[in-house]
């Protein structure tokens, strides 16, 4: 059903991308069951529906939030608070040298325990270390390549311009709520089964590939 909705609102270059993106959306609801989670990268020139890809993820992925740039503190606080998908549009800005720190957090946080931010809070003269985690599903849209380490964690969805007319995925459409209800129901009824089969997935694959494709 998710694949059908994707085909109604976005035109991918390869037909298999519909299944990949649909599976990624479903997996976001189970990401706490996994040790690592792959990122999605919509890569292409202007007017290739990259941002639309993120908008659809924003409608369907778990507790998704879409941004066009953020500070380290805002990024980590958002992920730690929502425990959902973090979507970055115009992600070529991450290639700026001033964003080296936040790129490091993005690159590290594809695994559980990675990308943690610690701050010292002083209350009534007592020091307390607070820890915020940034492990979560993440997706990007950009015209240029991402940082090499960050790109290495991504499933790349190459986008091209198309003449095919597809309707805009407006946020008020009832289908988004219906699909999210189905996805939450799937999580509540199947999370134990997912935890059970996850350790045996990806056998025979190399380390990084196995990490990224096991979910």
Task: State the predicted function of each range.
Residues 68-85, 92-100, 104, 124-129:
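Conserved alpha-helical scaffold flanking the Walker A/P-loop in AAA+ ATPase domains
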Residues 85-113, 143-152:
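Conserved AAA+/SF3 P-loop NTPase catalytic/coupling segment centered on the Walker-B
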Residues 82-85, 114-118, 133-139:
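Loop/turn-to-beta-strand initiation segments
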Residues 1-80, 201-204, 209-215:
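P-loop NTPase catalytic core of nucleic-acid-dependent motor ATPases
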Residues 58, 62, 101-128:
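Conserved catalytic/switch belt of AAA+ P-loop NTPases
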Residues 128-134, 143-215:
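Phosphate-sensing "switch" segment of ASCE/P-loop ATPases
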Residues 32-35, 76-81, 99, 112, ...:
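Conserved catalytic network of the ASCE P-loop NTPase/AAA+ motor domain
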Residues 25, 57, 89, 106, ...:
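Conserved RecA-like P-loop NTPase ATPase core
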């Amino acid at each position: 059903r998710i694949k059908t909705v994707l085909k109604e609102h976005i035109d991918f270059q390869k037909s298999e991308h519909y299944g990949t993106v649909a599976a990624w959306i479903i997996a976001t609801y189970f990401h706490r069951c996994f040790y690592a989670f792959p990122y999605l990268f919509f890569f292409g020139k202007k007017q290739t529906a990259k941002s639309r890809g993120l908008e659809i993820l924003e409608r369907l992925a778990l507790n998704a939030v879409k941004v066009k740039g953020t500070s380290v503190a805002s990024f980590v606080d958002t992920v730690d608070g929502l425990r959902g998908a973090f979507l970055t549009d115009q992600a070529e800005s991450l290639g700026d040298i001033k964003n080296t720190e936040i790129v490091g957090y993005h690159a590290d946080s594809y695994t559980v325990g990675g990308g943690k931010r610690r701050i010292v809070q002083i209350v009534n003269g007592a020091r307390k270390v607070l820890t915020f985690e940034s492990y979560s599903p993440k997706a990007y849209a950009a015209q240029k390549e991402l940082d090499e380490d960050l790109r290495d964690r991504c499933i790349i969805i190459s986008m091209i311009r198309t003449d095919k007319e597809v309707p805009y995925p407006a946020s008020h459409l009832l289908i988004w709520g219906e699909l999210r209800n189905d996805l939450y129901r799937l999580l509540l009824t199947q999370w134990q089964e997912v935890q059970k089969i996850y350790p045996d997935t990806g056998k025979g694959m190399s380390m990084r590939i196995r990490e990224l494709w096991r979910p």
